[in-house]
Amino acid sequence: MSVKPYIGRFAPSPSGELHFGSLIAALGSYLQARALKGQWLVRIEDIDPPREVPGAADAILRQLDHYGLHWDGEVLYQSQRHEAYREALAYLREHGLSYYCTCPRSRIQQLGGIYDGHCRALRHGPENAAVRLVQTHPVMAFTDKLRGDITADPALAREDFIIHRRDGLFAYNLAVVVDDHFQGVTEIVRGADLIEPTVRQISLYQQFGWQAPDYVHLPLVVNPDGNKLSKQNHAPPLPEGDPRPVLVEALAFLNQPVDDDWRALSTETLLRQAVEKWDLSAVPAAAAANPAFSNALR
């Protein structure tokens, strides 16, 4: 049996520029793909206009290029993929795998945050309604190539989750599965904050009859308060100067070796050596870093 060529990806949302936490996800996925002689794709997940920052998508691509993380092929923009998402929704609808839900958020909050399937048998129409997936065979666990077997919260795994929002926007879980399948992604390397929705995404793969990719969830960078470094927490953008000190700090965060003479290396050579020495098994499952570097190294 032939082995599928490796295809990895980095898929940021344009809600702001990349920060050190974003770099960890980008660098980890890049090194894994290059070490396995595979492709590394970039996708801009611009399906939530209210959260997007004008110019952020272009800024992200410039940052990746500045840090030597050069992608293969054309960048895919989710904003240009609406027809594919509509086709996916139609397929699920035609096969009885989705339904319209008019329950307000307040009702679900009263239930403790987990939806109870109230609208599944009510045959609502599309007006002022979200679309939910029928969880016929919920995925209760999956294997992470870094963390081993991960068991989901049973209530979360069984929930009929939203795949098309009431406001007309496509839900993240639907779009990411449709696009990863379309792009032939064989392994997803991303941050540990996305462990929770993984079982939902695998269940969507099964509903479509597609093979799910492998998963690797990297450790998250946290700020001194213990919160995930994020755009919402006002994480500073990556420095615009010499990328090498920041790349070295990112490699150290991922527990990867770096030569003492790295300052004599070009960015290209530094990354090439990082690819040659890449060891996924050395990456810690949990780690923390103080993002103050981004001010100190400007």
Curated annotation (Swiss-Prot):
Keywords: Aminoacyl-tRNA synthetase, ATP-binding, Ligase, Metal-binding, Nucleotide-binding, Zinc. Gene3D superfamilies: HUPs. Its cofactor is Zn(2+). Signal peptide: none annotated. GO terms for biological process: glutamyl-tRNA aminoacylation; tRNA modification. L-glutamate binds at R9, F10, A11, P12, S13, E45, Y172, R190. InterPro entries: Glu-Q_tRNA(Asp)_Synthase, Glu/Gln-tRNA-synth, Glu/Gln-tRNA-synth_Ib_cat-dom, GluQ/Sye, Rossmann-like_a/b/a_fold. ATP binds at K231. It is an enzyme of class 6 (ligase). A motif ('KMSKS' region) lies at residues 228-232. Binds 1 zinc ion per subunit. A motif ('HIGH' region) lies at residues 12-22. Zn(2+) binds at C101, C103, Y115, C119. Its EC number is 6.1.1.-. The keyword Nucleotide-binding applies. One of its GO terms (molecular function) is ATP binding. One of its GO terms (cellular component) is cytosol. Catalyzes the tRNA-independent activation of glutamate in presence of ATP and the subsequent transfer of glutamate onto a tRNA(Asp). Glutamate is transferred on the 2-amino-5-(4,5-dihydroxy-2-cyclopenten-1-yl) moiety of the queuosine in the wobble position of the QUC anticodon. Belongs to the class-I aminoacyl-tRNA synthetase family. GluQ subfamily. This is Glutamyl-Q tRNA(Asp) synthetase. The gene is gluQ.
